[in-house]
Amino acid sequence: LGTSQASKAVTADSNGDIIFPDNDILKFGTNSDWTMTYDESNDDDLVLTGSDISIESSTSAKPVLTLFNSNADANGSTIKLNKNGSSPATNDVVGNLDFISEDSGNNVTTYGRIQSTIVDVTSGGEEGSIDFYVAENDGTLTKGMEIKGLASDADVTVDISTHDGTAGGLKLGGTLVTAEAA
């Protein structure tokens, strides 16, 4: 494509591959609503800037998102949910994984959620929690379990928050634990 600087030209090679110069930005929309940047100067990152990304398929059990690490060391791939705001605070939600489908009336329903929150944002005393939510009875998303870091070193609690000793709560080997903690 035409440009006033040859070093900024987008080219196609003999294989039909389209080549963008290093550290340039691909913009989508008249207001650059989405941008894609290949940042060669750091970790060879591909940076997408915009709001939402959808990967769609009408094929059974698709789409599948695969992170493939072929390194022979002991470390694997990572999914990182990074909330990088200017004023982190206690009780901020760091990230969610939502499991959404429809009910028999075609109403969109969140059937499960894994949520991480900040318990204590104090530098040197950071604590977090991971909460597990599931839809119960009328589709209400209810916290069933919380794993929470405490202010003492190496201490973590696991709370089955809906345990009532009769209908809901902790099961061991499929049997509901009927006793409640004092």
Language-model segments: what does each one mean?
Residues 38:
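Short beta-strand
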Residues 5-28, 33-35, 43-102, 109-116, ...:
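Short Gly/Ser/Thr-biased coil->beta-strand turn/linker motifs
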Residues 1-3:
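Beta-strand-rich solenoid/repeat architectures in extracellular/passenger domains
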Residues 105, 119-122:
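Extended, low-complexity, turn-rich repeat/linker tracts enriched in Gly/Pro/Ser/Thr and Asp/Glu
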